[in-house]
C-alpha cells in the first residue's frame, strides 16, 4: 500500500463522552493529544487528506469528547483526545472530559502510542511538561510532533527540538517530527511513523 493511501480512508465512528461509551475495536489505536488549539483537528485532516474529517475551530477547548476514527476499515483507529489547558467550557465539563481522557490512556488495551502535539510558535509550556511527566510516570509511549512550523524561523524550531532532547525521558519515541498542516510539511513522515508503529 502506498504511503499516501494508508490514511486516506477515514470514517468517524463515535464521540465518547463517558467511560461506558468508550468503544473497543480490538485493532491498534494511535491517540493524538495536545494543548487546546494546538492544531489536532487540522493535523488529522492533513494526514487523512480530507479537510472535512475533523472539525476545526479557532476557539480553544472545542473538543469535549474522545473522537474515534476508523482508518482503512481495520488498519487502525485514530483517537482524537480533548485538548488540555485553556477552555471556555465550565469547570465541571472540563473535569469530566479530562477524567475520561485519563481513564482511556490508562485502560485502553489497543493503544500503541500517543502523538503529543506541541505548538512550535508557542513552545513548551509547563502544562505540556506536566503531561509528558504524567505519560512517563505511567509508562505510556509517546512521540512529539511540532505543529505550525510554517509560522516560525528555523532557529526557533531548533530551540524547541534541542530543549526536549536535553530532558531525561524514557518513554519518548523518536524522531521528533516537525509539521505544518497548511503546507503539508512533515505529514508524510508522520504517516510513515504511524504505519511503522502499526506494523511492529
UniProtKB/Swiss-Prot annotation:
Pfam families: MMR_HSR1 (PF01926). CDD domains: YihA_EngB. The gene is engB. It comes from the Bacteria. The keyword Nuclease does not apply. PROSITE patterns: G_ENGB (PS51706). Keywords: Cell cycle, Cell division, GTP-binding, Magnesium, Metal-binding, Nucleotide-binding, Septation. Mg(2+) binds at residues 41, 63. This is Probable GTP-binding protein EngB. Its cofactor is Mg(2+). One of its GO terms (molecular function) is GTP binding.
Amino acid at each position: 500500500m502506498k504511503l499516501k493511501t494508508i490514511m486516506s480512508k477515514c470514517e468517524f465512528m463515535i464521540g465518547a463522552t463517558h467511560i461506558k461509551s468508550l468503544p473497543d475495536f480490538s485493532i491498534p489505536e494511535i491517540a493524538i493529544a495536545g494543548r487546546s488549539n494546538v492544531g489536532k483537528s487540522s493535523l488529522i485532516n492533513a494526514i487523512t487528506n480530507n479537510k472535512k474529517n475533523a472539525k476545526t475551530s479557532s476557539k480553544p477547548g472545542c473538543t469535549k469528547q474522545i473522537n474515534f476514527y476508523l482508518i482503512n476499515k481495520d488498519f487502525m483507529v485514530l483517537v482524537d483526545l480533548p485538548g488540555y489547558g485553556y477552555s471556555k467550557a465550565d469547570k465541571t465539563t472540563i473535569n469530566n472530559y479530562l477524567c475520561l481522557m485519563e481513564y482511556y490512556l490508562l485502560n485502553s488495551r489497543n493503544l500503541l502510542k500517543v502523538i503529543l502535539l506541541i505548538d512550535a510558535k508557542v513552545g513548551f509550556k509547563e502544562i505540556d511538561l506536566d503531561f509528558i511527566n504524567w505519560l512517563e510516570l505511567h509508562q505510556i509511549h509517546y512521540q512529539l510532533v511540532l505543529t505550525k512550523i510554517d509560522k516560525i524561523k528555523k532557529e526557533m524550531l531548533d530551540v524547541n527540538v534541542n530543549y526536549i532532547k536535553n530532558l531525561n525521558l524514557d518513554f519518548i519515541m523518536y524522531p521528533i517530527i516537525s509539521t505544518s498542516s497548511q503546507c503539508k510539511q512533515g505529514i508524510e513522515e508522520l504517516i510513515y511513523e504511524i504505519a511503522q508503529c502499526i506494523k511492529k
